[in-house]
């Protein structure tokens, strides 16, 4: 046996025992998650070592078909039928649900079975597995809708777009797939005109962290922000979520800290604010973050996955408006995004980086890039809080005066 394979097998076996030990006691602890990450990494390396070069190439070439099969599984109601059934489901039963032709449906089911998205328990007889269930969740269904309609076409065009610009780091959205496809129309303007896709986008954003740690898991929220807050002032604003979609972050703060004092303000574009539930205990405000922020002197301003949608010049505009609203020595800006290390970046962060590049000429930033960007607008990073490589960091930022 190849020495590398033997080494990886031993690593997988050892890590497997560690994961089993954690599973019985502290499944969601940092140590447990780290063991599982290491096991997944070793298992993927082992898969590569067990394949010959031709098989490795085939895996990458044909792997792009997998999301298309999953999309069919959702669109035809296959996954939902399997998950809802207490017994194995026949091809005939799936035909009744999907309305698909028997020959085509059999081909789709063979494809789904071959990528282990369903469990084939007999001839034309199927059961759900973990993958099946994953794509009946809000994250699985809304995410695949967004990725199929926007992200995947953008990725396909990326090599051509980069070649056309002489392989210069892209900063102009008009030169990337989305801008070329839709005559330079800004991405979020285009999305706002498509209610069904916009709904999928917001539902995906609300579940994007499923399977990952939340920033409130590792940032000492109360200890960092409550001591200096004037809870006796009924008009005092505790937190402003800038560009916060429909308010899932404020809702999570309120869920974890139900007694938190002060006003909680959600800001986003009018089309998004119109979707906010008025009973959720936050103030919803239509606001364009490229204009001055009307909420002055809040204890905390929060940005999650906003700056990664824009190049440095546009980010400077957003940040300067927030800086001008901050009270020196009191207000804090919390930026919740990836801070990619220069060595050992995880694939989740790098995949997101290329997704943003392809769609909007945007970027997931490195730690050095964050420091440079903040300094350029009169802000200072007090600390970067990071739990795990595949979890977005929390940058704690103050105003420099």
Swiss-Prot record:
GO BP term, pick one: secondary metabolite biosynthetic process
Physiological role: Methyltransferase; part of the gene cluster that mediates the biosynthesis of chlorflavonin, a fungal flavonoid with acetolactate synthase inhibitory activity. Within the pathway, cfoC is responsible for the methylation at position C8-OH of flavonoid. The pathway begins with the PKS-NRPS hybrid synthetase cfoA that uses benzoic acid or p-hydroxybenzoic acid as a starter unit with four rounds of chain elongation using malonyl-CoA to form the chalcone skeleton.
Recorded metabolic or biological pathway in which this protein acts: Secondary metabolite biosynthesis; flavonoid biosynthesis
Residues given in the record as S-adenosyl-L-methionine binding sites: 268
Keyword Cytoplasm on entry: no
Name of the protein in question: Methyltransferase cfoC
EC code(s) of this entry: 2.1.1.-
Disruption phenotype: Impairs methylation of the flavonoid skeleton at position C8-OH.
InterPro entries the record matches: COMT-like (IPR016461), O_MeTrfase_dom (IPR001077), Plant_O-MeTrfase_dimerisation (IPR012967), SAM-dependent_MTases_sf (IPR029063), WH-like_DNA-bd_sf (IPR036388), WH_DNA-bd_sf (IPR036390)
Gene name in the database record: cfoC
Superkingdom assignment: Eukaryota
Family to which this protein belongs: Belongs to the class I-like SAM-binding methyltransferase superfamily. Cation-independent O-methyltransferase family.
Enzyme class: transferase
